[in-house]
């Protein structure tokens, strides 16, 4: 019997079990053709048994701010505040958090007028008549430039200290998984009755970059002692009398929240769940999704362990499956939206920010030691195999 292994603390090295991230696990893999003049890439097919992933999403809500991804018009990115006394009531989803919840925000600034710095603000509001304490358990926020540019990386790299990443989202999530809270984030916020606190005031500068494009990814785990509402907003840096830029104040963020509309431009409108005509458009997520974690033991049916496959055989478990991409399992893992804007995604496709904690209790049924390889793959998105 091989001891149980947690895939997120140890990944062994020569394969017969395949675990695929970002859209699932499968056997088909096709590189993207980036230059039309080059020959079409080959389609690699590997025979494998694809299984439905056991378990389910937990009930911890996730504030998911990802639409619009490319911000050119300042405004409200995502607000779960009550719509009362707001100039644009439809921009506020009226969803309160209590206890543990997570916050994910991912937005870009692209060629802004006069290269002005775009700020992303995150607000928390206490609607009650008693103080509320919000603990910031872990938190990280990174810019694409210079913190975490997108770069091609080897298929497998050791990263004992979190030094391997490509893009700000990967680096932020890596920090949170390591239990890090960056110094820019407070250990806790004490919010007085009826008051609003500023959790984040993050600039996305583009001036001085070779291309005036930059982005920011933020991931935070929070725990509140009472009900709170949350919002993310985008605002171009206010200017001082001398023309220089400064960070927005809490009061300026509140004014935008109370009087502003949704930031723009808006992303593509998604295909309804019952839509059957035309291309399937997922849309981008802006809302509150149900579930921040997925725990499971990968075992054979009616068993307590997973028998090592015969030599040359492969077992795959699908991760982050979604509508139109269940990889033959008919299982949709995408988180349900508890609150969303009408022009944004119906489900949290891709499950960004969801922590998969998978245990594989392997059982060696042979009479000799066996070497098992565990790998994460990104296959072609298919619904049927």
What is each residue range found by the language model?
Residues 40-98:
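N-terminal, Lys/Arg-enriched amphipathic/low-complexity engagement segments
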């Amino acid at each position: 019997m091989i001891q149980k292994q947690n895939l997120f603390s140890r990944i062994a090295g020569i394969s017969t079990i395949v675990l695929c991230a970002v859209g699932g696990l499968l056997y088909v893999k096709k590189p993207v053709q980036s230059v039309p003049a080059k020959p079409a890439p080959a389609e690699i097919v590997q025979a494998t048994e694809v299984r439905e992933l056991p378990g389910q999403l937990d009930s911890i809500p996730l504030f998911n701010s990802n639409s619009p991804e490319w911000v050119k018009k300042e405004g409200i990115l995502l607000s779960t505040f009550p719509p009362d006394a707001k100039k644009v009531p439809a921009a506020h989803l009226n969803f309160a958090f209590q206890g543990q919840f997570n916050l994910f925000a991912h937005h870009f600034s692209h060629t802004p007028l006069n290269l002005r710095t775009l700020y992303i603000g995150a607000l928390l509001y206490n609607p009650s008549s008693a103080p509320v304490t919000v603990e910031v358990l872990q938190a990280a926020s990174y810019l694409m430039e210079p913190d975490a540019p997108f770069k091609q990386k080897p298929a497998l790299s050791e990263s004992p200290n979190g030094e391997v990443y490509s893009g700000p989202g990967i680096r932020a999530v890596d920090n949170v998984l390591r239990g890090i809270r960056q110094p820019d984030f407070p250990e806790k916020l004490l919010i007085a009755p009826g008051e609003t606190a500023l959790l984040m005031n993050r600039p996305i500068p583009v001036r001085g970059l070779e291309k005036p494009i930059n982005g920011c990814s933020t991931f935070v785990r929070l725990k509140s002692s009472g009900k709170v509402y949350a919002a993310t907003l985008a605002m171009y840096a206010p200017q001082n009398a001398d023309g220089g830029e400064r960070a927005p104040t809490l009061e300026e963020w509140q004014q935008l929240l109370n009087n502003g509309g949704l930031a723009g431009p808006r992303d593509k409108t998604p295909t309804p769940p019952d839509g059957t005509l035309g291309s399937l458009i997922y849309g981008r997520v802006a809302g509150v999704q149900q579930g921040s974690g997925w725990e499971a033991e990968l075992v054979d049916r009616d068993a307590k362990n997973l028998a090592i496959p015969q030599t040359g055989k492969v077992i795959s478990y699908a991760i982050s499956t979604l509508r139109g991409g269940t990889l033959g399992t008919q299982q949709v893992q995408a988180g349900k939206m508890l609150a969303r804007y009408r022009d944004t995604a119906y489900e949290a496709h891709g499950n960004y920010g969801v922590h998969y904690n998978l245990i594989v209790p392997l059982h060696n049924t042979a009479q000799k030691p066996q070497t098992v390889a565990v790998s994460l793959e990104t296959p072609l998105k298919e619904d049927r195999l």
